[in-house]
């Protein structure tokens, strides 16, 4: 079994997911959350130390438009996460761009967050209630997921498809 840590970076908080796969498919979510960036730095160091996780992080791409301070702050955090992964593993994380996620999961660059979430549900939790979250009594594949955690799962799935399964995007 292999393990992937995927990060959807933000300027203050970031979504992350740790998933386990068997080379054929992602089989389960081990951990998911949205936490303060400085806490995530510590978590990265703790989780990666000697564990052999693959690491993927969503990378910001230039779109030809003016951006605000939040985007630049997010870029700084991407660099800090990158450096921590490099120190712990000897290699940097794999960059996953949003356009790759859209193509991999939806087959279209015009896909929106709702389309990506539905593609994830269709793939990992078909027929499960509440977008695959289930209930407290009967948790589904995506139990505990909210907001940026879905984006982190899209990063993990795209990384898995592209680098583990070898799907051409």
Residue ranges: model-predicted function:
Residues 1-169:
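Phosphate- and other anionic-substrate recognition elements at nucleic-acid/protein interfaces
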């Amino acid at each position: 079994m292999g393990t992937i840590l995927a990060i959807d970076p933000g300027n203050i908080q970031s979504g992350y997911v740790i998933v386990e796969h068997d080379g054929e498919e992602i089989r389960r979510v081990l951990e998911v959350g949205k936490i303060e960036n400085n806490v995530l730095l510590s978590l990265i160091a703790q989780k990666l130390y000697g564990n052999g996780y693959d690491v993927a992080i969503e990378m910001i791409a230039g779109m030809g438009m003016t951006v605000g301070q939040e985007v630049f702050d997010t870029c700084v955090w991407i660099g800090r996460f990158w450096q921590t992964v490099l120190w712990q593993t000897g290699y940097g994380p794999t960059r996953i761009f949003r356009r790759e996620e859209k193509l991999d999961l939806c087959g279209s660059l015009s896909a929106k967050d709702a389309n990506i979430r539905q593609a994830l549900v269709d793939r990992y939790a078909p027929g499960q209630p509440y977008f695959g979250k289930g209930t407290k009594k009967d948790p589904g594949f995506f139990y505990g997921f909210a907001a940026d955690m879905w984006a982190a799962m899209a990063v993990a799935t795209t990384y898995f498809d592209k680098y583990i399964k070898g799907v051409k995007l």
